[in-house]
Amino acid sequence: IKLADTKTADGGTLSLFEQDGDYSISFDGQELMHSRLNASEKLLGELGLARLKMQSSERVLVGGLGLGFTLQRVLSTIRKDSQIDLVELLPDVIDWNRNHLSKLNGYLLKDARVKAIAQDVIQTIRDAEPEKYDAIILDVDNGPIAMVSPGNDSLYAQAGLSGLFRALRPGGRVVVWSAGPDKGFEKRLKR
């Protein structure tokens, strides 16, 4: 059952579906995520916080809300005095989580540690003060390869990576979800 859909800036259609208590999000008919297949999103949140000192008041940027599984893992890991800037490009996806997905993960948006921001994460990173975040966790598009929206390639280009690392505190961590290995992206990360 289609619960909702919205248009993206490039004219594509993002749709939310429910079937027998399971949810999925598709872009122009291609399934991007499913509530039964959430291990990689949870692992992303876990890896984003791994090896951080977790002393006090961590500041975490989560780019991309989707069905909320990365946010769920981050919230279950960080301290009570931490803050998460949850940045989602499409305001409708935030609304879907609050309304249609409230029982799945939408309740997470009510957590006082979460600030939901409807904005392009690329802009959020550009506008960030230097050394603002302890962790930056990105599940944007399909990662550096197989992108749904070509405009997202600037996030994974050298200038985008420089912005990410500028916004990261010393000892912090950037973790990026990717649909598969990308040797070019790996080389850019090493520069």
Where are these regions (language model features)?
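A SAM-dependent methyltransferase catalytic signature shared across enzymes that methylate proteins
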Residues: 185-191
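The AdoMet/dcAdoMet-binding core of the Class I SAM-like
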Residues: 38-170, 176-179, 187
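A short, aromatic/hydrophobic, helix- or strand-capping loop or linear motif
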Residues: 182
